[in-house]
Structures are given as structure tokens and as C-alpha cells.
């Protein structure tokens, strides 16, 4: 199937699931500890070459923490030689001035550093790592020193949302060019911890108001910092156009080579091919996994006849699966969905007390335990 299928313009290379932090909102799969057979340097080179030949132009290096890969500089250099615009998505842990210099030499275009909170104590508690804040702060200074655009990301949730002023002030102190204040998206570990992470409507309204006030202040000062506030669809009545549509632009390759239309799709009971077994072009155009939710033939009638279907593409398939057990159901976020009460229930639960210490932190021990108790689909290498 190639007719009407666009190009995979954005390649996400999940280099590893390994990470020194234990963030309870991580989007990695709950059973990540079971997936250890990472692609080799040469295998990643081959992925980049194929993707570039297909028309991919932007390449994101993520994880886990991509810096645990000692060949990261080699991977960046190869991608740069192929003409990719490259972006490193990192916690900053494992970054040093020497590595920043080496990555600059290799041709890396962009570094995005994530923080957990503006307060060092809260930051390190959420990261599950001592001195994480100190390391991140210093690395941000060095990123700026080496003339990278300063892009900071804060995952916002009920345990840090009331610090929104301090978060923005920290970003200004670090001379950030762009700040992404992204309300937690509930996939992977974040979905497991949803009751302890989802902010209340009141918290969200306050945070958005304060962000808008800062935007006006910065605009009046002709300040270059750009504040991006990403609202959670749990407080919307229409679903987001997830990944701009299934298999339309994004191509994700997991650490073990599984090819996915988005990084959260691994949890679905759908067979996805592996780049070790199939060419990327065959995966993109011919595989059952990538064609599964293209178009609108899969949609239930209410979605198929909806005038918004060409804008939201039916919403998020992973969210539909997590909440209803069937990825083909209408996204519960949609106010027209017969499952919308699940979202309303989640909003009500946000009013409950949920101490930080009750969160399940992302680490190998918890991953192995959850793998034994959760109903997680087991994928095998499949034919196209």
C-alpha cells in the first residue's frame, strides 16, 4: 500500500531503555527491562541510511537516556553526514563538557534538556537520583556555552505545577530560548501513576494563566524566550491529532529494532516488524502494523462520519486501548465518545490526595515485577 501514504519525515531513534533516573511519568513501556538486545552501531547506521533515502529529514535521539550509549557521537556524526537535522533529547545525566564538545564536533544541531522541577529537592525526589538538579543546571550552562539553542522541557504534573512561576524564572535564569511546559501525557509509567500525577482543573487553570502573564511580560520586554504550554487532553472535549495521524509522518525505532508508528504503540496487541528483519520502506508502506489505523476504514461509525476526522484522525489509538481495551474504539477524550465517562472519572480522581511517595518509580526492579503481573502483549518478529 503506497497510494496516499506520505513520507516518514521524522525519525525517532530510541537508542536504549537504560536510564540513570527513575521518573514515574516515563513514557517507556512498563516491561522495558525485558528488552535488552539493542541495535548495534552499524545497525543504527543502516537505519539512518534507509530512512534518509525514504525522505526523512529530522532525527531525534532519545531513550531511556541516549547518553548511556558510548557510540552516541558516532551515531550523530553518521546522521549529520547523511544530512539529517539532529536533536538530542536528554535528562542531562551523563553529559560532560567533553561530550558536549564532541557532539558539537560530530554535527549535533539541537539539545533538549529535561528538568523534573525548579526546586532541587523535588527535582531529585521525582528523578529518584541525588544531585540530578545540580548536574542538569550545570549542563544547561555548558549547552549555552557551546552555542546550542537552549531548549528546556518540564513535564508538569500535580507535584510541580504549583511551582510554575519558579519554573519559568529558572528557565529565564538559564537564558532558555524555548521552554516546553508539557502537562504530563499519560502513557507508559505515567498512565500507571495517573491518579498521582494528573493535576486538578484549578491547578491547570492557574498554571496556564501565569504562563500567559509571563508571555505578555516577555513580549513587552522584547525578550526572545518562547513559552510553550502543552495542555493535557484529559481536560479537553476533542481528541488530539496524535502523531499527526497514524503512520503519516513519524517513524519510531525502539532499542531492539521494533518499528513503531509512535513510541507508545509497543503496548498494543498488534504485530510490528523489526528493522533487523525488514527494510524500512517495506515496513512503512506494506506492514500490517503501520497500515492498521491509516485512513478511516477502521473507525467506528460515529468517528467515520464525524466532520472532525480529518483534523484529529480519530484521536489516539494507544489511549483508546489503555482505557477501553480496544485500540479501534473512539478515543475517550472526545466528548462524543461512548467512553468519555472514563475521562470524567479521571478528572474527579485528581481531587484525591496522592502523596509523591505513593508513585511507582521507573526502575528495573519495578519493571520486572510489573512484567510478571500486568497483561502486557508479547511481540515476536513478524513478517510484513
From Swiss-Prot:
Function statement: Catalyzes the cross-linking of a glutamate residue and a tyrosine residue in the PqqA protein as part of the biosynthesis of pyrroloquinoline quinone (PQQ).
Keyword Chaperone set for record: no
Entries under SMART domains matching the protein: Elp3 (SM00729)
Keyword Translocase: no
Pathway the protein contributes to: Cofactor biosynthesis; pyrroloquinoline quinone biosynthesis
Cofactor note: Binds 1 [4Fe-4S] cluster. The cluster is coordinated with 3 cysteines and an exchangeable S-adenosyl-L-methionine.
Binding site for [4Fe-4S] cluster: 19, 23, 26
Name used for this protein in its record: PqqA peptide cyclase
Gene Ontology terms describing biological process: pyrroloquinoline quinone biosynthetic process
Gene3D superfamilies, A to Z: Aldolase class I (3.20.20.70)
Keywords recorded for this protein, A-Z: 4Fe-4S, Iron, Iron-sulfur, Metal-binding, Oxidoreductase, PQQ biosynthesis, S-adenosyl-L-methionine
Quaternary structure note: Interacts with PqqD. The interaction is necessary for activity of PqqE.
Family per similarity comment: Belongs to the radical SAM superfamily. PqqE family.
PANTHER family xref list: PQQA PEPTIDE CYCLASE (PTHR11228:SF7), RADICAL SAM DOMAIN PROTEIN (PTHR11228)
GO MF terms held by the record: 4 iron, 4 sulfur cluster binding; cyclase activity; iron ion binding; oxidoreductase activity; S-adenosyl-L-methionine binding
Domain Radical SAM core intervals: 5-220
Cofactor(s) required for function per UniProt: [4Fe-4S] cluster
EC number(s) recorded for this UniProt protein: 1.21.98.4
Swiss-Prot/TrEMBL catalytic activity: [PQQ precursor protein] + S-adenosyl-L-methionine = E-Y cross-linked-[PQQ precursor protein] + 5'-deoxyadenosine + L-methionine + H(+)
Amino acid at each position: 500500500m503506497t497510494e496516499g501514504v506520505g513520507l516518514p519525515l521524522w525519525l525517532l531513534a530510541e537508542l536504549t531503555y537504560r536510564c540513570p533516573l527513575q521518573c514515574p511519568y516515563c513514557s517507556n513501556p512498563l516491561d522495558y527491562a525485558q528488552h535488552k538486545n539493542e541495535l548495534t552501531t552499524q545497525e543504527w547506521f543502516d537505519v539512518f541510511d534507509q530512512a534518509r533515502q525514504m525522505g526523512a529529514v529530522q532525527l531525534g535521539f532519545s531513550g531511556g537516556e541516549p547518553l548511556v550509549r558510548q557510540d552516541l557521537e558516532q551515531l550523530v556524526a553518521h546522521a549529520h553526514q547523511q544530512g539529517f537535522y539532529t536533536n538530542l533529547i536528554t535528562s542531562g545525566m551523563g553529559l560532560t563538557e567533553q561530550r558536549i564538545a564532541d557532539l558539537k564536533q560530530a554535527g549535533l544541531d539541537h539539545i533538549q534538556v529535561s528538568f523534573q522541577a525548579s526546586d532541587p529537592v523535588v527535582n531529585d525526589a521525582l528523578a529518584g537520583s541525588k544531585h540530578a538538579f545540580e548536574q542538569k543546571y550545570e549542563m544547561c550552562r555548558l549547552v549555552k556555552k557551546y552555542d546550542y539553542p537552549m531548549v528546556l522541557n518540564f513535564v508538569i504534573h500535580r507535584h510541580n505545577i504549583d511551582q510554575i512561576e519558579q519554573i519559568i524564572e529558572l528557565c529565564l535564569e538559564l537564558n532558555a530560548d524555548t521552554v516546553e511546559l508539557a502537562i504530563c501525557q499519560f502513557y507508559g509509567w505515567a498512565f500507571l501513576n495517573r491518579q498521582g500525577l494528573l493535576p486538578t482543573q484549578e491547578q491547570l487553570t492557574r498554571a496556564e494563566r501565569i504562563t500567559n502573564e509571563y508571555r505578555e511580560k516577555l513580549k513587552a520586554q522584547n525578550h526572545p524566550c518562547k513559552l510553550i504550554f502543552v495542555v493535557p487532553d484529559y481536560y479537553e472535549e476533542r481528541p488530539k491529532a496524535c502523531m499527526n495521524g497514524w503512520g503519516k509522518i513519524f517513524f519510531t525505532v525502539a532499542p531492539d529494532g521494533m518499528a513503531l508508528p509512535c513510541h507508545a504503540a509497543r503496548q498494543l496487541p498488534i504485530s510490528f516488524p523489526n528493522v533487523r528483519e525488514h527494510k524500512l520502506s517495506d515496513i512503512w508502506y506494506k506492514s500490517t502494523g503501520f497500515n492498521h489505523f491509516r485512513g478511516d476504514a477502521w473507525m467506528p461509525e460515529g468517528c467515520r462520519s464525524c466532520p472532525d476526522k480529518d483534523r484529529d484522525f480519530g484521536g489516539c489509538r494507544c489511549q483508546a486501548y489503555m482505557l477501553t481495551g480496544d485500540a479501534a474504539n473512539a478515543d475517550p477524550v472526545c466528548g462524543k465518545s461512548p467512553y468519555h465517562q472514563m475521562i470524567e472519572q479521571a478528572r474527579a480522581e485528581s481531587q484525591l490526595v496522592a502523596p509523591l511517595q505513593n508513585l511507582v518509580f521507573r526502575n528495573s526492579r519495578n519493571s520486572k515485577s510489573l512484567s510478571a503481573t500486568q497483561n502486557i502483549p508479547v511481540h515476536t518478529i513478524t513478517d510484513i
